[in-house]
Amino acid sequence: MISAIIEDIKAIKRNDPAARGLEVILYPTLHAMLFHRFICHPLYKIRLFFLARFFSQLSRFLTGLEIHPGAKIGPGFFCDHGMGVVIGETAVIGRNCVMFHGVTLGGTGKHKRKRHPTVGDNCFIGTHSTLLGPIRVGNGVKIGAESVIVNRDVPDHCTVVGAPAMIVKRGQRKVHPPEPLPFSSYRLDEVKRELGMVIEPDMVSDGGGI
């Protein structure tokens, strides 16, 4: 946990030219990570859910970042400004990710299994972007401000913008016209499972034929 916090401090210095010295210890993103890494997430893992939520709410009040205790966040996380950020329970964020204020990593549906985004390593998520559902955002992805992604995966090393977001760059190569994002592989598997549950009883009652 200490090594993760050290990486978080390095991320502040690396991504914000205004961070010149000891003032990094005043950044809300660092305070939020201290709460999450040392208190909220450990309490959640040992199933002390009320205490975990209590301290996450305290962190939200002090920092403006709403991070569910169940979220998994890799080292080197930096959230500039931070106000209005929402990170859901089953969200996963990789190493060295940067996001700005107003970003939502939200869920779809009311089931208790995976329902929030998984974000890869070295990603950038711009101001007021909304990512919903059990989607996969690949490594090295850049998401432009106010983009909206619902139940769509983002391939590695792509730049996406818009509502709905579309691919405008793959690596260093511009994409014209912009390409739509592929449907969420997790959601497709979920639909297949649900279809299987519907079809299977019929197959049994009909003697196996469709």
Language model regions located:
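Structural signal for interior beta-strand "rungs" in well-ordered beta-sheet cores
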Residues: 60-161, 165-168
